[in-house]
C-alpha cells in the first residue's frame, strides 16, 4: 500500500524538526519512498556508515550518507514566493491536474496534462 507524499524528487524543502541545528535548513529532495512515507534530502540527516571492503580492491571505512526523514517533517518551499507552504492539488477546467501553493496560489507544477 502506497501513501501519498506531498513532495516530489527535485523539490526544494525546508526541515521543520530535527537535531537542533538542522531545523530550518533548506535542501533538495533526492529520493521519495512512498511505501514508508519518507524522503531523502540532500545534506540533511547525515549518518556515518561503517562499511567493510567487499572485494580485494575496494577500500572500507566510514562513509557519510543521508538517512531518510519522514515526509511530515519537511515542508515544500514554493518556487514562486520562496516561502514554506502546504500544497493544494487542483483539477482545472481543461482537465489538467496541478500542484498549487496555498500561500500565493502560484502553480508549482503540472501533475497530469489535459486530456485530449
UniProtKB/Swiss-Prot annotation:
Q: Which GO terms describe its molecular function?
A: rRNA binding; structural constituent of ribosome
Q: Which Gene3D superfamilies match?
A: 2.30.30.30
* UniProt record similarity statement: Belongs to the universal ribosomal protein uL24 family.
State the species of origin: Acetivibrio thermocellus (strain ATCC 27405 / DSM 1237 / JCM 9322 / NBRC 103400 / NCIMB 10682 / NRRL B-4536 / VPI 7372)
Keywords of the record: Ribonucleoprotein, Ribosomal protein, RNA-binding, rRNA-binding
Question: Which taxonomic lineage does the organism of this UniProt entry have?
Answer: Bacteria, Bacillati, Bacillota, Clostridia, Eubacteriales
Q: How does it assemble?
A: Part of the 50S ribosomal subunit.
Please provide the Gene Ontology terms (biological process) for this protein: translation
NCBIfam families named among the record's database cross-references: rplX_bact
Superkingdom, according to UniProt? Answer: Bacteria
**Gene giving rise to this polypeptide:** rplX
Q: Name one Pfam family in it.
A: ribosomal_L24
Q: Quote the function comment for this protein.
A: One of two assembly initiator proteins, it binds directly to the 5'-end of the 23S rRNA, where it nucleates assembly of the 50S subunit. One of the proteins that surrounds the polypeptide exit tunnel on the outside of the subunit.
Q: Name one GO cellular component term.
A: ribosome
This chain belongs to the protein called Large ribosomal subunit protein uL24
Amino acid at each position: 500500500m502506497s501513501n501519498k507524499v506531498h513532495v516530489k524528487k527535485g523539490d526544494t524543502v525546508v526541515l521543520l524538526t530535527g537535531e537542533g541545528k538542522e531545523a530550518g535548513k533548506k535542501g533538495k529532495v533526492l529520493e521519495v519512498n512512498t511505501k514508508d512515507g519518507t524522503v531523502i534530502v540532500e545534506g540533511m540527516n547525515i549518518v556515518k556508515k561503517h562499511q567493510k571492503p567487499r572485494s580485494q580492491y575496494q577500500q572500507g571505512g566510514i562513509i557519510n550518507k543521508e538517512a531518510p526523514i519522514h515526509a511530515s517533517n519537511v515542508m515544500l518551499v514554493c518556487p514562486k514566493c520562496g516561502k514554506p507552504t502546504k500544497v493544494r492539488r487542483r483539477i482545472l477546467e481543461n482537465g489538467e491536474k496541478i500542484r498549487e501553493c496555498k500561500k500565493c496560489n502560484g502553480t508549482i507544477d503540472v501533475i497530469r496534462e489535459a486530456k485530449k
